[in-house]
Amino acid sequence: MNASVFSAAFLLLSLASSAVYAALSDEVSDPPDVPKLNTQPWVPARYKAVRENLLGKECGILFVGDSITECWEREGAALWKRLFVPMKAVNFGVSGDRTDSMLWRMEDTELAVRTSPRYCILLAGTNNIGLWKGRQPAEQTVKGIREIAVRLLKRFPETRLILMEVTPYGPDPDSPLRRRQEEINRLLRRLELPRTTILSINGSLLKPDGTFREGMFKDHVHLTEKGYLAWADALLPLLNGEG
């Protein structure tokens, strides 16, 4: 291949690579309120477990969410066993789930518990922020969260919903993804839904300057046992009828 042909081929390859990169950078997020299966490789085993734990079971409290909810069974396991198992709590959290994936699981299972829960606790939106690197507008993420909430309230007409504000995304209060998370929470606080309490634990997780309190997080989003204790402390007055 002579130099001119090689240069032309290299130019074409560079242009093609640039086009692919631009397409990935401009990728549009999936509709947050349209059910879609989470296809990440660890999901089938986890979904099988939560499905078996849900269908036909007594349910006093239903936790719906992503890995932060799932990890009640790991970092929060001692608290879960002591505080929530006696309340017949069911963990319907799957790591990596966005709002669309939670909706898919709700449709697939029909949330067919044997007894309707007294409370549903919903924490959603973290992976809508993370997967799309902040490209999904806050209004769209809230649209997905609201759709989950509406379906839960419709499915369980006597149940009360505790809608959690999204927990902090990253230790830097000035980062774009943290600002997106806070924007989502501002919009969540404006929602008007029946039988719903909107609850934030972020004041317990953050210092006054917005950075992480020591010992609350094991990484940029996931809680330690101490973080789960803060969540439990906020939930228990509501679950026990004191709030």
Model-derived segments and their meaning:
Residues 145-150, 185:
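Generic structural signal for well-ordered alpha-helices
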Residues 70-85, 99-143, 151, 162, ...:
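Oxyanion-hole/transition-state-stabilizing segment in secreted/luminal serine hydrolases
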Residues 32-38, 91-98, 130-137, 220:
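Acidic/histidine-rich helix-loop elements
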Residues 60-65, 88-93, 118-124, 128-130, ...:
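Structural recognition of the beta-strand scaffold that forms the well-ordered cores
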Residues 168-243:
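Catalytic His-Asp segment of secreted/periplasmic serine-dependent ester chemistry enzymes
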Residues 1-64, 68-81, 115, 242-243:
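N-terminal secretory targeting modules
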